[in-house]
Structures are given as structure tokens and as C-alpha cells.
Amino acid sequence: MSEQVNNKVLITGANGFIGGALMRYYQNQGKDVIGVDLVGNGKDIIEGDISQPDTISSLLQGSDVVIHTAALVSNAMQDSDMWRVNVLATRNLIEAAKKHKVRRFVQISSIVAYGNSAEGELNESQPVLADGGSYVLTKLASEHVVLQAQANDAIEVVIVRPGDAYGPGSRPWVIVPLELIPKYQFMLPAKGEGFFRPIFIDDLIRGIYLAASHPDAAGEIFNLSCEDCRLRLP
């Protein structure tokens, strides 16, 4: 079945690594796309806080698809802030999207939904596990918020669980390692015994694009990552 034509696409967290790459991809495809982030650029990225109802309402007018990448990712943040941004703002956004007759809502979650201790190959049928910090807990809670919102068939939802996205400009998996490795300060996942589930940013963006556009993707959860691997010191 062919892809549906997305009219106006709204991307939250448009200045982020994933959000920015999505903006460029849609623009290169000639699509009508607009972004929102705490810092705008005066052009295609609007300055706004998605936790504020006025911001949400104005952005959603005429939008056909919302791709929600905005989130706090550091466990160093206060739990209350993580909950406000990752869960409450998601709830407000998708409820507003329903009111504005948005057709599809794509929630960018994370492979950590299966828990930090998950080993081996993962598939979407496996149970989730809240064994991490606030990031894991709020990502799982935001998934529940999104899944509940589709209960009345008022909006199509898709959840994407990316692995560790890397590529040019990636701070956690490119910039920071290149800074720390010469200093012998780079720590491997679980001291070299943990699983690393990488995905190149271009592959991830194509996957998200299909999640947002393919008719059969509605109501589904997708893991997007490459083959599992362990990173060990030689």
C-alpha cells in the first residue's frame, strides 16, 4: 500500500538532533513542515513552549501530522520537570491535536522502554520494563498517554522506539566520545558488557517518515535500530 500524502507536518523539538534532521528531510522532500522549539529561527522553527496551551493551539491549526520529538533526556533533571515536559506536555499536545482534527500523531519514544537491563534482540511484542530513572519512567508514561488518546479512533497514533541514534552532530554518540576517548574517559555501556542498539540518523529519519505517512502504520509500535552489539575494549 502506498504512502499517504502528508499535508502540513508539525515537528516538536525541531532544534534537536532528531527533530532537526526530520525538518531537513521533509524540506528536501518539498513537504509543508513547521517546527517548534524553545528557541526559534524566525523562519520555519517557531519559538514556543509546547506546555503552554496558546502555543499548542496556534501551531496545530491546519496540521495534518504531528511528530513529537521534544523531551528532556537527562536523568540529572528534576523529576518534576521530566514529568511536566515528557508526560503532561505530551498529554496536552495530543488532546489539542484531537480537537484540531490532526490525522496522525507520531510519538518518538525510546528503546529504553524495554528497560536498561534488556539483553539480546528485542521485538515489539516484548513487555516494557520500568527499571531506569526518570527518563525511562516518563517515556513509558508518555506512551500510555498517547495510546489512550486513540481509544475513540479520534486520531491515529504511532509510537517509534529508536535505538541510540548517531551521525554528524550527535553529542552523546559522536561529539562527546571523540572528546573523551583521547583522555581515556569514555565509558562503554555496562563496562563493555551491555548491549548497544545503534541506528544511523538517516535510517532513523526514513523510518519515522514512513511511520508518519504509511497507512498501515496507524496504531502500531515500531522499534528502529540496527543489529544489537556489544562494545568491548581491545
Q: Where are the language model's segments positioned?
A:
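Catalytic helix-loop patch of NAD(P)-dependent Rossmann-fold dehydrogenases
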Residues: 119-165, 186-189
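NAD(P)-dependent short-chain dehydrogenase/reductase
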Residues: 150-196, 201-202, 210
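Conserved Rossmann-fold NAD(P)-dependent oxidoreductase catalytic core, especially the SDR/UDP-sugar
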Residues: 92-134
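N-terminal Rossmann NAD(P)H-binding glycine-rich loop of SDR-like oxidoreductase domains
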Residues: 9-29
